[in-house]
Amino acid sequence: MALIPDLAMETWLLLAVSLVLLYLYGTHSHGLFKKLGIPGPTPLPFLGNILSYHKGFCMFDMECHKKYGKVWGFYDGQQPVLAITDPDMIKTVLVKECYSVFTNRRPFGPVGFMKSAISIAEDEEWKRLRSLLSPTFTSGKLKEMVPIIAQYGDVLVRNLRREAETGKPVTLKDVFGAYSMDVITSTSFGVNIDSLNNPQDPFVENTKKLLRFDFLDPFFLSITVFPFLIPILEVLNICVFPREVTNFLRKSVKRMKESRLEDTQKHRVDFLQLMIDSQNSKETESHKALSDLELVAQSIIFIFAGYETTSSVLSFIMYELATHPDVQQKLQEEIDAVLPNKAPPTYDTVLQMEYLDMVVNETLRLFPIAMRLERVCKKDVEINGMFIPKGVVVMIPSYALHRDPKYWTEPEKFLPERFSKKNKDNIDPYIYTPFGSGPRNCIGMRFALMNMKLALIRVLQNFSFKPCKETQIPLKLSLGGLLQPEKPVVLKVESRDGTVSGA
């Protein structure tokens, strides 16, 4: 029996031509950076450099920065990605040319009606949403929301106390994840849940389904390698956000909105109420008001952007405080001085706490949740003498820049003093970008910081944290697409009144 099929010459020729065409399709963009004289790792047909992500985005970016210097090019599938680390170039991309050239983020799959969410929307649609939503995130509005957030800080303390009383080490992801979910579902959807003690609540179950998300899972990798699948999936009504979950949340917002419109009493200030108010405001006449579907999309994206990030950063902060007891003690002393006898924090007292701000900023330097910032180049452009063709994704590797010894002495060390009044003026705002920069930075930055600081104050007023045998030291990062610890942070919790967990 012949090992090679006995095919006609025409068939062999057709097969050879098909293979050549397939190879050309799989590599058609891969010569771009070589042609532009930009260094970078060698791509594979179809895959580009995505196999290099097996160590995680952070390590890939750190290695490339070390090997290639200020600028390098690589390929996600066939998508050319240009990494830049020069602060002047970063400023041009994020600020100076934001509206004209670098307005949009990279599309990440079929998103359905979520294309109206502020983090995903593009061009004029994004500008309109930003104008409508910016008043929702002012310091004045945030001040009015502090009592809602503080209420869940008290729930967090109760949950931690109960965990501490068991005498076992505490997995911080559980308690901080519940706090984060409670605050965001309350402010975005107007529902009150103690999610740690009510895991069966339909809101908790649906929100958790929404958050099972990893940019390195096979679905996202397949649409990275074969981007032509995205419009096909859109036509087939397939969406990266689970439809059963978005339908549930749409109905919930509709119900809550109807209930609030029927009730003539003054409602509490939360994101949902502020968005409902903006729909009826005369001030929005220059822009088309938010539609009901757009309102739902913003509520969902607030959960999506805020849940994982808040709980992860709080876990990272507590890990650093537990492994740096001198910093923890100094922070507790500041909190006790500003708020004696465990007085509840207010918006103004939080702003008085300089050392708290330093600790949070230094943690965000070591663990920037947005490991990368990306903008799509809308047209051929030259910036700082470098030509960037239309369609290239420009990427700023925040994690690598936050640990670059050129800008930070002993970059791997946790040193809050970097952000003291005396030192912070030396920090380049385009090297330290935990929330992005420019017009398209994180719109919820103030809210996220206040949310985390209120939690930290309440927790540190009541507890001290120490490493235990289950604590992973040094902490390792997950290789997934989100910046998280490889293993959940587990610590011993001591009540400042005397109770000990994990002893």
UniProtKB/Swiss-Prot annotation:
It is a single-pass membrane protein. Expressed in prostate and liver. According to some authors, it is not expressed in brain. According to others, weak levels of expression are measured in some brain locations. Also expressed in epithelium of the small intestine and large intestine, bile duct, nasal mucosa, kidney, adrenal cortex, epithelium of the gastric mucosa with intestinal metaplasia, gallbladder, intercalated ducts of the pancreas, chief cells of the parathyroid and the corpus luteum of the ovary (at protein level). The chain crosses the membrane at residues 2-22. GO terms for biological process: aflatoxin metabolic process; alkaloid catabolic process; androgen metabolic process; cholesterol metabolic process; estrogen metabolic process; lipid hydroxylation; lipid metabolic process; long-chain fatty acid biosynthetic process. Changing residue 373 to F: In allele CYP3A4*12; has an altered testosterone hydroxylase activity. Changing residue 56 to D: In allele CYP3A4*7. CDD domains: CYP3A. InterPro entries: Cyt_P450, Cyt_P450_CS, Cyt_P450_E_CYP3A, Cyt_P450_E_grp-II, Cyt_P450_sf, Cytochrome_P450_3A. Changing residue 170 to I: In allele CYP3A4*9. Its cofactor is heme. Changing residue 174 to H: In allele CYP3A4*10. This is Cytochrome P450 3A4. The gene is CYP3A4.
